Regions:
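N-terminal hydrophobic/helix-forming segments and targeting peptides
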Residues: 1-238
Length: 238
């Protein structure tokens, strides 16, 4: 991967994009593909499609979803803590102690999902905080009024976890599911244009996959492709 492609991947991974709030990531994707795509279009649902018009009759679509799992603020307590609910399939067993970033109209607000110190836990009692809705987020607010000055109910949030390079060519980070997919779709389109393929190629970035493939259902009725390749991540079980 050259430096330009790496920079594009880093931009996608650093841009918050929880389901239903994909606009920032889609803007970054559109800005990139607009430098080489012949056409770039969006639909009413928020999906983005960049196209190379081939001279032949065949067409393919390469798709990925732009959204990621996250949270949404559901309430604010009198003590100034936030209650959150999952957006998509967030795992409650790993959320406690996780730093998060709440996306507000005024900009990001940092917080952490509270974790009871091991010294204070009642190990004989059932652990109710395995439910994300029972967990608290501390943003440093002294009380409810102070918290409401910073955050509103309904604001989305994401884990505040960045990109880390592992050994070899592997990486770990937030949002690889599925910024990797829309990165691949853009790269396939770029290479198709470089080679001036006769096949028409659509690169597609869809929305709200984590909520039930909602964006893909809509865009699937808009693109008349002979074949569709959906790119997504899967379990590291090999």
């Amino acid at each position: 991967m050259d430096s330009e492609r790496r920079e594009f991947l880093e931009t996608l991974l650093s841009t918050p994009s929880p389901s239903g709030y994909e606009t920032p990531a889609l803007r970054a994707w559109i800005e990139y593909v607009s430098t080489f795509a012949e056409t770039v279009e969006t639909d009413a649902y928020g999906n983005a499609v960049a196209t190379h018009e081939g001279k032949g009759d065949l067409s393919i679509a390469v798709t990925g979803h732009a959204d990621e799992i996250g949270y949404a603020v559901s309430s604010i307590t009198e003590e100034g803590f936030l209650r959150i609910i999952p957006v998509g399939g967030s795992d409650p067993t790993v959320s406690r102690g996780t730093p998060i970033e709440i996306q507000t109209a005024a900009g990001p607000v940092d917080g952490v999902i509270a974790q009871t110190a091991i010294h204070l836990r009642d190990r004989t009692a059932p652990d109710e905080t395995t439910d994300i809705a029972a967990q608290h987020v501390d943003i440093g607010a002294e009380d409810e009024a102070a918290a409401r000055d910073l955050v509103e109910v309904g604001d989305p949030a994401i884990p505040a976890i960045g990109l880390t390079d592992l050994a070899g060519s592997r990486i770990t980070g937030r949002g690889i599911d599925n910024r990797a997919g829309i990165w691949v779709a853009a790269e396939v389109l770029r290479r198709a244009i470089d080679r001036d393929l006769d096949v028409t190629v659509h690169a597609v970035a869809t929305v709200q996959e984590e909520l039930g493939l909602k964006g893909a259902e809509m865009v699937g009725t808009e693109i008349d492709a002979d074949a569709v390749i959906a790119v997504d991540v899967t379990h590291a079980s090999d």
